Amino acid sequence: MASNSHDSWNHALAELALNHDLLRSDSRAVMEEILGGNRTQEEIAEFLALHTRKGGTAIEVSGFIEAMYAHAAPISITDRAVDTVGTGGDGFHTINISTTSAIVAASAGARVVKHGNRAATSKSGAADVLEALGIRIELNGSQVAQLVEEIGLGFCFAPMFHSAMRHAGPARKSLGYPTIFNILGPLSNPAQPNAYAIGVAKAEMFPIVAEVLRSRGADALVFRGDDGLDEISLSAPTQIYVIGSGRVKQDEIDPQEWGIARSPIEALRGGSAQENAEHLRAILNGRAGAMRDVVLLNAAAAIIAFEGFTEDVMAENISERFTTALEKAGAAIDSGAASALLESWIERSHQV
């Protein structure tokens, strides 16, 4: 890419106008311009509109995230950890499935460092429900790392770590439709964990997320319900990418295989942050039903990703792995470990 940043920006826009994919270096340079506050909202909106029309690639996403990491506040998690997250934007307004699943997975032995924000398209994002539970979320890197070390669970509140992303906020809002930025959050956990369980709402983004994680060398499960849910679904089979050792295996899972009943998405409908916090507590306290079932499935995905895969990921029997992980997740709730961990998290978040 041209050395002058003005030329670099114009070069990238010209490429996008011709429907050409950007190189990783081009993508990083463009994001550096945005995060550095060097571009007007009109210029950023023009870039996002052109990029959305063309469609994104895994190489572009990797370049964008490279720049985000260069600007991110530091956090160091030395031990193996997993993030469990959905891209959002599925329009179903469910309870906070991945947040509840994170607590269950951590209480079952996975080390979880979750990255999230306030709601963008729903009534209650991860940050909103955690605040409603009484958890202090505005923590720096050393405080989050301390929690992960002490209780096996921590939350990176995105604005605390990716503050430069504020430069793109008004432009994104002015466009009024999803852009490539919508999948950057789930892929840019500042702790850079080794493992991920990520749900993807948009079909066109599904393989891109998988390829970014493959190229990163992560262990991951990336999934999308056939109903469009950005979680492992109860109302339809779920497509899943199993990622490990730089390889990707595509599979399909159906909860009925483990005796979990089909349930409509309406059975998972959430509400305000306070209402979702009440649902979360009830699930951790052992309430049965569809909400528990979907949390068990998604917690199992996080447990599997955390435990990792053999070198021959193509030989992995993902069905067997889910059978074992579902038992661990269920036991974590039924033993009281999950609800106890939540109370520890609330308490320790105010003490670190």
Predicted regions and their residues:
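Short beta-strand segments at enzyme active-site cores
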Residues: E43-I44, V113-H115, V222-F223
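Active-site cofactor/substrate anionic-group-binding motifs, chiefly glycine-
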Residues: G55-G116, A120
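Active-site-proximal loop->helix
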Residues: A119-I135
